[in-house]
């Protein structure tokens, strides 16, 4: 409960101050350089994936369509927080308006909720492709793909809307200093003058149920996939199937391990996990998957790598010919 009635407009600060990574201020410049390099890599890699898939009609299969959406979500997630982080680390520009802070919180958490759903749909795609190859096109029709994508998005919005409403109706009458590099829910909740436990419990239980159910279904899919793969008579076919799935497993590990570590480190508190470790984990969580996903999929998926290379050559030579 929020307790007694509050005049919300009087208890809303004009802005918050993001402190970056507490205790590592001396390393902020090096962190800014590293984050900038990773962000540029993420933007280029994910944009190339979206473009290569979008422009080639032969790559409109479910796996590539889901990968295209994943790349777009990674761009949104990284772009929601990294530019402001770099600004804080480089120039000390730590101020962020109240509305911008809550918008940032909404989009970064929405993107993470969409991404876990996408990883589940991609696991289902691999399950159908390997365990039911003859029925692949009949099961994963464009209508089914659209329905799955819509369901993932609606679930994420349904999860985030109550959380945003609860946070937006908390009074912030004390300090406006956010001990974090971006407007993460739990860091903002600690500044509230009223009891933040309802929103914090909703966030923890909701995200645990969402991620837990997705991981359970993904694990079940891969158990069935491995059984089907090892039943194949050809070693070459086994290796090809395992190689295709390996990239997906790598992407899942990059997403779930730092994500869950970040969530539970924040809940354990700084008596167990130092505050700078909590913030650094949360920062890396929003940029590392976006940076490495295109590299993993590009290097492990020969067709996609060829498509990206073909698009780059076409882009470079066409422009050089126009220039001459």
From Swiss-Prot:
InterPro entries: GPCR_Rhodpsn, GPCR_Rhodpsn_7TM, Olfact_rcpt, OR51/52/56-like. Pfam families: 7tm_4 (PF13853). GO terms for molecular function: G protein-coupled receptor activity; olfactory receptor activity. PROSITE patterns: G_PROTEIN_RECEP_F1_1, G_PROTEIN_RECEP_F1_2. GO terms for cellular component: plasma membrane. Disulfide bonds join 101-193. Residues 1-29, 80-103, 165-200, 263-278 are extracellular. Glycans are attached at residue 7. SUPFAM superfamilies: Family A G protein-coupled receptor-like. Its main location: membrane. It is found in: Cell membrane. Residues 51-58, 125-143, 222-241, 300-324 are cytoplasmic. Coiled coil: none annotated. The chain crosses the membrane at residues 30-50, 59-79, 104-124, 144-164, 201-221, 242-262, 279-299. Keywords: Cell membrane, Disulfide bond, G-protein coupled receptor, Glycoprotein, Membrane, Olfaction, Receptor, Sensory transduction, Transducer, Transmembrane, Transmembrane helix. Odorant receptor. This is Olfactory receptor 52I1. It comes from Homo sapiens (Human).
